[in-house]
Amino acid sequence: MNKKTIITALLALVSLGASAQLESVKELKMKSEYFNHERQVLIYTPAGYQDFDQTYYDVIYVFDSQDRAKFDLVHCLTNLIPLDENKHFLVVGICSPSSENYFRNADYLPVPIHAKDAESSRGRFSDERAYGHSADLKKFLKHELMPYMTTNYRTSGRNIGIGHSLSASFVLDCMVSDDMFDDYIAISPNYCYDEYRLYNDLEKYPWMNHKEPRFIYTSMGAEATSWDPYWQKGWQQASTFFSDRSHFPANTFVSVQQFPGYEHNPGYLPSLTEAMNEYLQFSTSVLQQHLSQETYPVHIELQCENMKGDVYITGNQEALANWNPKGVKMNQVNDSTCSVDLQLHLPAYFKFTRGDWEHGANILNAEPGNLIIHETEPTTRVYRLWNLIPWTGEDTK
């Protein structure tokens, strides 16, 4: 590449950077048939979301997002952790209302089932406004919020739940009762409520029946030794259970962490940082190796103003030549388009090349790195080359 081309490319990158869509947070109020009040929701989209129309995003659901710092920290960390700089997420914050008629606890606690003497067994949760609507929140998620995200955003189909304290308990309860999410991050959860109900449910859950890859993270700060004996016992039981690999299938990744130098709220920062680091490792290793047993038809097109020379596609399975850079040769449709029809296991990870790794495609409408097809729809995927420098390593003079 000559000096003139390099200068032109740098100027073009500056121009693109100036015009690219920035990260954004949308505030939404949703009516729900399960609540008498509107549900406030925050939706974060990463930079370039509008431009990268062939990138589909995993969705992180963050509970207790009425504490805005919890929500903001999640999407900040997804950009700052350097393990996979091209892995970005949609982040959805679920805000609990704060009013004299509805407490935050009501979102996350089920009605006690072990209550003989209501006042003594419910303790500080004795007020009826302070518990009992967790089943309604699950219905809101499953039947209203998640379908809204699927309809209005490009989602990959993989969902992660993150909670702290009572909302962490709720996230784990979503797993044992509904398999609501694919992956779970529970920071400082309450395992002792209602006579250790959550821990007992975790013990009974049929872990070995779950065949898909799953990430589970749970942690505790100084509460593990400084809070009341019931809380300490709940954590001791749960952490011992989660630490025993014999309870889980091989493709379930479980992490148990302690942060004894941090109290309940300050512990959210170091714990979430550790959780996101571990999750990105899981995402870029385990998830990429797990393929569906079935194959699905996919029509893939690559477009450019002047499509000259041979083009190959290669990726993470036999139908994509198992990352051989001179993999599957694409068909030349016309001067601006080449295409290929394949039967692929999902998720499919792939790249376009000129036949070697020194000449890879610069894709304009997808995030850099591996291109990914997660879902069976749409069956046609159209990628566009950057017209100025469509291929790395080629002189465009």
What do these predicted ranges mean?
Residues L22, P297, G327:
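Beta-strand-rich binding-surface signature
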Residues I7-L10, E394:
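Serine/threonine-rich, low-complexity intrinsically disordered segments
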Residues Q21-Q293, G309, T314-A319, V333-C338, ...:
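Non-catalytic cap/lid and distal C-terminal segments of serine-dependent acyl enzymes
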Residues L10-S19:
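Hydrophobic h-region of N-terminal signal peptides that target proteins for export
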Residues Q303-P347, G355-E375:
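Aromatic-rich carbohydrate-binding modules that target alpha-glucans
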Residues N306, P378-K397:
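Compositionally biased low-complexity segments at domain edges in trafficked proteins
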